[in-house]
Amino acid sequence: MWIPDSKGVYPDLLATSGDYLRVWRAGEPDTRLECVLNNNKNSDFCAPLTSFDWNEVDPNLVGTSSIDTTCTIWGLETGQPHARVYVAGHVKTQLIAHDKEVYDIAFSRAGGGRDMFASVGADGSVRMFDLRHLEHSTIIYEDPAHTALLRLAWNKQDPNYLATVAMDSCEVIILDVRVPCTPVARLSNHRACVNGIAWAPHSSCHICTAGDDHQALIWDIQQMPRAIEDPILAYTAAEGEVNQIQWGATQPDWIAICYNKACEILRV
C-alpha cells in the first residue's frame, strides 16, 4: 500500500505486510527498505500480520491486524539527518481486539478521520475502536453462526456505513454503525465466495464486489433499507476467480481486478 499523501509532503513510501510491517522508499536509482516494524524483539518467532491500513488523514499512523488477536497502531516519523530522509516507527498502542485471530483492519473517516477504526476476525464480529477511548470498543455486528469475517471496508463518503464478508460466503453485508448488529442490506448475487470489496471513492451509494464466480459487480445501495436485488453493472473475468479489486481513488472511472496471473483495468 502506498502512503496516502495527497499533498506530496512525504517521501514516496510503500508499506508491505507478512511476518512484519515493512516500509520502503521508492526512488531513483533504486527502492530501499527504510524500516521493519516489530513489536516483539525478544522472540525469534512472530505472529503473522493479516492486514494493515494507512490512515488517510494522518499518514503518520498505520494500523495492523494479526493472528495473535491484536491490533497495533504504529506511529511513523520521517526526518532528514545528514541530508538523507529516514523513516522510523514506534508502537502508539497495541490492544487485544478480538477473542480469536484478527483478519482485517480499516480506519474510518468518522470524527475527523484520525482516531476511529474497525476490525473483523475469526470470532465473527465487527468491532469499532476509538484511539482516544481504548478502554472499550463497540460491537457493530456478530455473525449469527459465528463464522469468521475476513474483510471489511468503510464507505468513502459516508462513514456511517461499512461492508464486510464472511469466510466462504457469497453474500456481502452492509452495516450502519448507528444501528448495531442489524445489517441494512445484503448483496447476494454472487454464485461463489466473495473475495474483495471496494466502495466508490466519489459516491456514497456505490460499491463493487468480486468473487470466485469470476464476477465483479457494482451495486447501487441508495434504496436501503429496501432489499437490493441486482447489481447495476457486471463484468465476468473469463479465465479465473477474481481475487482482489481496487477502485481508482483519483480517477473513479477505473476499477482494477486481478485473477490468475492477470490484472485488468476496467472502465466504469
Name these PLM-found stretches:
Residues L37-L49, V87-G89, L95-V102, Y141-L149, ...:
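WD40/WD-repeat beta-propeller blade N-cap
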Residues T16-D19, T64-D68, G75-L76, V120-D123, ...:
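Conserved strand-to-loop turn within each blade of WD40 beta-propeller repeats
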Residues F45-P48, D58, V91, E101, ...:
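WD40/WD-repeat beta-propeller blade-loop signature
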Residues M1-F52, D58-V62:
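Eukaryotic helix-linker segments that join adjacent hydrophobic helices
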Residues L21-G27, C71-L76, I105, V126-L131, ...:
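WD40-repeat beta-propellers
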Residues W2-Y10, F52-P59, A106-R114, A153-P159, ...:
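Loop/turn segments within WD40 beta-propeller blades
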Residues V165-D168, S188-R226:
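Loop/turn-rich, solvent-exposed surfaces of beta-rich toroidal or solenoidal domains
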Residues N243-V268:
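Blade-level signature of beta-propeller repeat domains, shared across WD40, Kelch, NHL, RCC1
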